[in-house]
Amino acid sequence: MFTSLSPYRIVVTGRIKHFISAFGEHVIAKEVEEALAQAISKAGGEVSEFTVAPQVNPASGELPYHEWFIEFEKLPEDIETFANTLDQGLQAQNSYYKDLIEGKILQRLKITCVPKGTFVEYMKSQGKFGGQNKVQHLSNDRKIADNLKW
């Protein structure tokens, strides 16, 4: 959106943080969207909204991982197949992510299914409800993840 014509000034809005790199993996939105499309194609389901956050220090001492919070309009036929396909799709597109998985720095992603309306309620709680406001899909921290309520 233009905010000034003299001098020219444009404000970029929307999803401007299109990456996650908490572990040096540099995963970008395009890779996430393509892997998600592959998972839906193979396992079925319809995704309403999602966000991905790193779990850097899991409580049980396990390896860190990416946690996907997904609101499904329709659940996949097999959530495990969905998760495997999603992870394999990311590894196929992003060699850094693949190296971290194979090197046992990260474990495979984990999916947390959230009820319908979770992201709408989150956006309302942030004062960002409306057509021009979008859920951030990728984050290097857990600010969104830790504020989701269900």
Model feature map: region roles:
Residues 1-150:
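AMP-binding adenylation
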